[in-house]
């Protein structure tokens, strides 16, 4: 129950009907609907969107609560994600390719062992020569770091070449 004012100032008890809006509110709603274009009204209850959420002409509207399925976006097959240890289809259809790669790997490994035996002595001599520079303590850290960096780069290049020969 709420109190409403009469023209003479009398107050009378009137039941509160929350479902029925006032006449003034109805007029305001009708006026705002007349001024608002139909395309700017939202789908829910024909309410106007706030100014910060007006639809943009440049960017399409998207919902922010939608989950993105990355499996449809990735450029590789989904089988590779679920089972990374599975062989590619080429090896499953033609298993003799595995034998070719196995033989090539053994040939390359024997060649690398022979090369390392040839290079092994100079590497040992190189490290021995660097160890004699112990008396030159000021230059030793710089020379050691440079020499090991060069050795690391050479080994990295060697592994890259082996990888290319095996897999390509």
Swiss-Prot record:
Transmembrane helix as UniProt keyword: yes
Entry's localization field: Membrane
Listed Low complexity bias regions: 49-63
Coiled-coil blocks: none
GO cellular component, one term: membrane
Record's keyword annotation contains Amino-acid biosynthesis: no
Region called Disordered, residue ranges: 1-63
Transmembrane portions of the chain: 119-139, 148-168
Major subcellular location class: membrane
Entry membrane topology: Multi-pass membrane protein
Highest taxon above the source species: Eukaryota
Biased amino acid composition, Basic and acidic residues: 1-11
Compositional bias annotation for Polar residues: 13-22, 35-48
Keywords, alphabetical: Membrane, Transmembrane, Transmembrane helix
Record protein name field: Transmembrane protein 31
Organism field: Homo sapiens (Human)
The gene coding this protein: TMEM31
